[in-house]
Amino acid sequence: VTTLKQVTIFCDGSSLGNGQQSQRAAAVALLGYKGYWRAVGEYLGRATNQQAEIAAAAVGLESLRQPCQVNVFTDSRYVVETMNGRFRRKTNLPWWERLDRAAGPHKVHWEWTRGHVGHLVQEAADKAARGIAAAGHVDPIILRDAVDKVGTVDDTAID
């Protein structure tokens, strides 16, 4: 019996100027495995806050190279409730399809975490997503700063 790797993902999306012509959105995920972290991000261009949140979870899951047991933490109730089947999918269907494909190979537990209350890993993902949205491209320095901020937080002790 093969045991799946236990991975923790904190993800956050950001849409600066949401609903405006100059809208810039980004998605970031911080992945933890045995106390080690890495960050992945994607510049989305014009996308809403909701779309950026969906993309952030997809970006994290897409970066996994093999099927894993994954705890995904997000401050988006929209993502958690939809992926847990409690909200119906009426809009953003291509975004949900991407997330479904990304989640497919994995055993995923979706968990909501309150945003902007000082949780170190969530705050690092939030700051990185805002930074990439503002920059208009994925800046490796922003991602490295997020990982440096998190350090070696024990992802196995997060609940």
Which sequence ranges carry the predicted segments?
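Acidic two-metal-ion nuclease catalytic site recognized across multiple nuclease folds
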Residues: 136-159
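Flexible, glycine- and charge-enriched loops at secondary-structure boundaries
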Residues: 46-50, 54, 89-92
